[in-house]
Curated annotation (Swiss-Prot):
The modification Phosphoserine is found at residue 352. Pfam families: 7tm_1 (PF00001). Receptor for neuromedin-B. Contributes to the maintenance of basal sigh rate through signaling in the pre-Botzinger complex, a cluster of several thousand neurons in the ventrolateral medulla responsible for inspiration during respiratory activity. Contributes to the induction of sneezing following exposure to chemical irritants or allergens which causes release of NMB by nasal sensory neurons and activation of NMBR-expressing neurons in the sneeze-evoking region of the brainstem. These in turn activate neurons of the caudal ventral respiratory group, giving rise to the sneezing response. This is Neuromedin-B receptor. The gene is Nmbr.
Length: 390
């Protein structure tokens, strides 16, 4: 039988009524399998997938952070946020994924009360850092494309770094209740045996899981996604309008700026798409269980859906470096140079990916055929680049 980290939903009704389905992000329930083949596959395949996720994720995210820290040309506002994403992913890969993989080798929760308090909070913190950073990145792209003249020209790296720290502070604070209410409980079984499990809320009534799942879905998925969608609606509208209304004398200059900004907007949008694709099944599954925990199918099919959703959610922590590698020429060159025996990174001077730090002409895309709004800001050698160095 698969490891019993959580209550078995196939228990009699009397027992089920007093046992609440734990959070899908922490010590998920695995239904009983009907044979040893499924058990063998689960115990071998899933931990192997987790090992691949951890290895690939650590390599990609560590390399990403190293490139941004060691190359001054890569230190831009968006890259600070992208590094923040990588840091959150590293936290998840180093803590939550190994703990989750251990469920396939142990039948009970083996990390004690302290682990039960910390692991759920760490995972929620990591998810918060990811989704809030993606929202901040979308807001940055909105300002760069729709309102470029509203962007700061001095102290921007410090200010952006403070924003990144603020994202971590908010994410930790929002995860505090998870640490407060998570507890190790002994769960009874229909064969008069019992096992310990870590659950994220008190075992009192069925209202707690419903409130918990709805809040998680709203705060860590739906609300940020709506905000990001609004930003990208205005970004798309501005880019489409500017493509038709730019006069001929500004076409060449503004076309390069538009391509640079559109490229970064595309990268951020891919990050958002990966996050939605990887986490949406987990959120939906948790909502379904929270509102129908007495009726959940304990079959092998339901177990497979659970495992797929779980693997997908953790996979999100290793996909961003791949997306960046495919979409960013400069990151790809730096990454390849790091892999090739630590050779010196390529100096980044490509105007299609990096704006000069000595003089940057910031042109508003809000223009029309009759009245072109063209604003220029000259930045000295110590000023910070407003566009991504990708």
């Amino acid at each position: 039988m698969p490891p019993r980290s959580l209550p078995n939903l196939s228990l009699p009704t009397e027992a089920s009524e007093s046992e609440l389905e734990p959070e899908v992000w922490e010590n998920d329930f695995l239904p009983d399998s009907d044979g040893t083949t499924a058990e063998l596959v689960i115990r071998c395949v899933i931990p192997s997938l987790y090992l691949i996720i951890i290895s690939v994720g650590l390599l990609g995210n560590i390399m990403l952070v190293k490139i941004f820290l060691t190359n001054s040309t890569m230190r831009s506002v968006p890259n600070i946020f992208i590094s923040n994403l990588a840091a959150g992913d590293l936290l998840l890969l180093l803590t939550c994924v190994p703990v989750d993989a251990s469920r396939y080798f142990f039948d009970e929760w083996v990390f004690g009360k302290l682990g039960c308090k910390l692991i759920p909070a760490i995972q929620l913190t990591s998810v918060g850092v990811s989704v809030f950073t993606l929202t901040a990145l979308s807001a940055d792209r909105y300002r760069a494309i729709v309102n470029p003249m509203d962007m700061q020209t001095s102290g921007v790296v410090l200010w952006t770094s403070l924003k990144a720290v603020g994202i971590w502070v908010v994410s930790v604070l929002l995860a505090v209740p998870e640490a407060v209410f998570s507890e190790v409980a002994r769960i009874g079984s229909s064969d008069n045996s019992s096992f310990t499990a870590c659950i994220p809320y008190p075992q009192t009534d069925e209202l707690h899981p419903k409130i918990h799942s709805v809040l998680i879905f709203l705060v860590y998925f739906l609300i940020p996604l709506v905000i990001i969608s609004i930003y990208y609606y205005h970004i798309a509208k501005t880019l489409i309008r500017s493509a038709h209304n730019l006069p001929g004398e500004y076409n060449e200059h503004t076309k390069k700026q538009m391509e640079t900004r559109k490229r970064l907007a595309k990268i951020v949008l891919v990050f958002v798409g990966c996050f939605v694709f990887c986490w949406f099944p987990n959120h939906i599954l948790y909502l379904y269980r929270s509102f129908n925990y007495k009726e959940i199918d304990p079959s092998l099919g339901h177990m497979i859906v659970t495992l797929v959703a779980r693997v997908l959610s953790f996979s999100n922590s290793c996909v961003n470096p791949f997306a960046l590698y495919l979409l960013s020429e400069s990151f790809r060159k730096h990454f390849n140079s790091q892999l090739c025996c630590g050779q010196k990174s390529y100096p980044e001077r490509s105007t299609s990916y990096l704006l000069s730090s000595s003089a940057v002409r910031m042109t508003s895309l809000k223009s029309n055929a009759k009245n072109v709004v063209t604003n220029s800001v000259l930045l000295n050698g110590h000023s910070t680049k407003q566009e991504i160095a990708l």
